[in-house]
Amino acid sequence: MKKVFIRTFGCQMNEYDSEKMLSVLAEEHGGIEQVTQADEADIILFNTCSVREKAQEKVFSDLGRVRPLKEKNPGLIIGVAGCVASQEGENIIKRAPYVDVVFGPQTLHRLPKMIVDKETSGLSQVDISFPEIEKFDHLPPARVEGGAAFVSIMEGCSKYCSFCVVPYTRGEEFSRPLNDVLTEIANLAQQGVKEINLLGQNVNAYRGEMDDGEICDFATLLRIVHEIPGIERMRFTTSHPREFTDSIIECYRDLPKLVSHLHLPIQSGSDRVLSAMKRGYTALEYKSIIRKLRAIRPDLCLSSDFIVGFPGETEREFEQTLKLVKDIAFDLSFVFIYSPRPGTPAANLPDDTPHEEKVRRLEALNEVIEAETARINQTMIGTVQRCLVEGISKKDPDQLQARTANNRVVNFTGTPDMINQMIDLEITEAYTFSLRGKIVEA
């Protein structure tokens, strides 16, 4: 049985793709063994991310560390997948000639054939094309290893924000046909999955073709998935404010399985910066979406992405971001220092803000967000939360770990038969990034 080591960088879409790589290899070889140490593997894969500069360089650092393994075992297969693969292509082979296969997100289904071609010809294989339809047509059924599962419903992005490489590495938006999505979710539900997380770089831009040739939009998809037997909770990520329609907002009113947590990236609270980013909305328009959502879901927890130090960002513009964060009360958000990505329009903009100032802004924004996270956690003490038990706690092997609808981790004392089940927990303690709870007796 082939032993496979895979390391995943970046977003949840990459996590989904890594699972699919393991699935196509398992189908090809009649099963595989996933190992946690590279030196135990027959196949080593790095599924890469190019959104941040450090993530990109980390890949080449990791490649350097596995090079001695290749020198000792020439039959070892080393592969680079994901967005760095799409962006760099043949350059990866030039920089690391011991790499055997390089493939993008849209060609992961071709991985087994690429390995065979490498072993037959002795030549490194590179395929970073964009055959979107092919990928979804050739993927095997999902492997189920828990009570929650990701389902990719669309790929790529057509928004072309000035700082972002996704349209260049994942291609234009492409939506899976509705029936394909529903079939995958129904199969997962039959295998015991209770929570579905719908994935896409711009998930709410979903426009899937139906059997009659009509188009199903994202709000309609949510309503259909809501009725699939066995599915008890629904999430989605990542959405774009430009596509956040009133019909999606109404789903939060009508669909109780849709969790009270939303990740909706805004990036900045400054209209000038948003315009320079080519985001396509103003801070006021974003706030209008949130007002509508909280009018029908007052308990909605909202997380977001922020970039500080975007070229030309002034102190006043950063203060506008701070004010927006306080006004909206964001929770559990992700803050990044701007990192210029090659080939994007923003990479050519003048940037005279010192790095030390960018770090200060990062820390200041994180401080405000973490304070709000702590406040929300405190308000949950004494409440009863419906939770999905994910497995053994990462902090204490004698405890179990569960997740609330608003995306909080809860550690509690339980029994192994509770894993992958939905249970009620009373929250007893609150920490910065987790909660402690106890089982509510029936």
Swiss-Prot record:
Residues 378-441 form the TRAM domain. Keywords: 4Fe-4S, Cytoplasm, Iron, Iron-sulfur, Metal-binding, S-adenosyl-L-methionine, Transferase, tRNA processing. Its main location: cytoplasm. Pfam families: Radical_SAM, TRAM, UPF0004. It catalyses: N(6)-dimethylallyladenosine(37) in tRNA + (sulfur carrier)-SH + AH2 + 2 S-adenosyl-L-methionine = 2-methylsulfanyl-N(6)-dimethylallyladenosine(37) in tRNA + (sulfur carrier)-H + 5'-deoxyadenosine + L-methionine + A + S-adenosyl-L-homocysteine + 2 H(+). It is found in: Cytoplasm. PROSITE patterns: MTTASE_N (PS51449), MTTASE_RADICAL (PS01278), RADICAL_SAM (PS51918), TRAM (PS50926). One of its GO terms (cellular component) is cytosol. Coiled coil: none annotated. Residues 143-375 form the Radical SAM core domain. GO terms for molecular function: 4 iron, 4 sulfur cluster binding; metal ion binding; N6-isopentenyladenosine methylthiotransferase activity. It comes from the Bacteria. [4Fe-4S] cluster 2 binds at C157, C161, C164. Residues 2-120 form the MTTase N-terminal domain. The keyword Nucleotide-binding does not apply. Belongs to the methylthiotransferase family. MiaB subfamily. Monomer. Catalyzes the methylthiolation of N6-(dimethylallyl)adenosine (i(6)A), leading to the formation of 2-methylthio-N6-(dimethylallyl)adenosine (ms(2)i(6)A) at position 37 in tRNAs that read codons beginning with uridine. This is tRNA-2-methylthio-N(6)-dimethylallyladenosine synthase. It comes from Neisseria gonorrhoeae (strain NCCP11945).
